[in-house]
Amino acid sequence: MIHAGNQKITNKEQSPRVGELRGELRRKMAAHTPNAGAHATAIPGLTLYHRTAPSPCYPAMFEPSLNVFVQGRKRITFAGMTYLCDQSTFLLSSIDVPVVSQIIAASEDVPLLSLLLKLDMAVVREILSQEEFHAPDGSSPARGIAIGKTTVDLLQPFCRLLDLLDASEDIPFLSNLIQREIVYRLLRGPQGERLRAIATLGDQSHRTAKAIAWLRANYTKPLRVEELAEIARMGMSTLHHHFRALTAMSPLQYQKQLRLVAARERMLVEGIDAASAAFEVGYESASQFNREQALLRSTADAGHQSASARRLRNGQRLTTLQIVLSRWTRKLSRNASANGLPGSLHRLKAKQLKPGRRSLTS
C-alpha cells in the first residue's frame, strides 16, 4: 500500500491497466468532443468536458455527481478547503454543493478532459436495498464533497459507457446497467459511506439533504431557519450542526453561494448586467451582490494560499530533517573511522533522505 494524504492507494489504482484505461478514455473523448466546451451526450446524466485554457476562479454548483478527470488539472475550493484534481482522481459530490472552480492546467495540445455523471439517489437507494453494506453510524457526518483515486473497477465501466455513444440503439437498456455498476463501485469504495448516509431514509444526513434540496429550489426567497428545520424534521441546533458538517457552512451562507452561482449563470447565459442578475436571484441591491462576489473570490484565494503554505512548511520540515540526518551520519562515520569499525557505517551517507522522496500531505 502507498499512502497519499489520508488515502490508501491499492495495487489496482497503481497497475499499468489504469494508464491503459485512461488512454482509452482520452481517445474516446477526442472523438466525441471535437471542440472546447461542455458536451451533453445521448446518455442521460453524462456530460463530457473539453477545456483548452486555464481559467480564473468562478463560482459553480455541483449536483450529486461523479466527476472523473482524464487529463489536465483543476482546483476546487469548498468552504476554505482546496481539492486538486488531476488524471488520477475523481471528485464525488453527494449533495448540491456550491464551490469555486478554477482550471489550472489545460492547453490546445493537452486539454483538460473530464466526465461528469449525475447520480440518481433513487438508484443509490435501490442498490442499497438489494446489497449488504455497512450501515452509516451517523456519529461523524462527512462533508458533501470528497476526492478519491480512480481504479480499474471504476474506469472500465466508464469506457463501456462511452462505447455506447457509437451504438445509440443500445443506450436505453445498457446505459442504465452500466451506471448502476458505477454506483455499486462507489458504494463499495472508500467514499461509499457518504452516499450511503445521504441515501439512507431517516439518517440525519438524509434529513439534512432534504433541507438542502429545499434551499436549492427556493434560494430567491427570504430564509427562515425555523421553516427549514421543520422540513428536515429536526431541531434548529441539530440542523445547524449537520448542515455545517455536510456543507461546511451555515444555511444562510449556503443560500448566499447559491445566489452567486445563479447570478453568474444568468449573466453568462442571458447576457444581462450584474444589477439585473442580482435582483432576479434575491439580492436587495447590486452592491450587496458585488461585495459577496468579492468575498467569495478572496475566500478561494485564501484557501489556495493556505494549501501552498502547508506545502512550504512540509518542505521546510523535510529540509530540517535532512540537515539533522546529515550531521548524524557524519558523526557516526567519524566514530567508525576512529574506532576501526567496519566500513558499512560510511555507507550510511548514501541512505540519507533525498529531496522529492517523501509522502507528506500537501
Identify the role of each PLM range.
Residues 214-218, 265-269:
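Short alpha-helical segment immediately N-terminal to, or the first helix within
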Residues 38-135, 320:
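N-terminal regulatory/effector-sensing and dimerization cores
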Residues 1-42, 47, 55-56, 138-143, ...:
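A short, N-terminal "cap"/entry segment at the start of jelly-roll beta-barrel domains
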Residues 181, 185-191, 198-204, 216-218, ...:
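Basic/polar phosphate-binding segments, predominantly the helix-turn-helix DNA-binding elements
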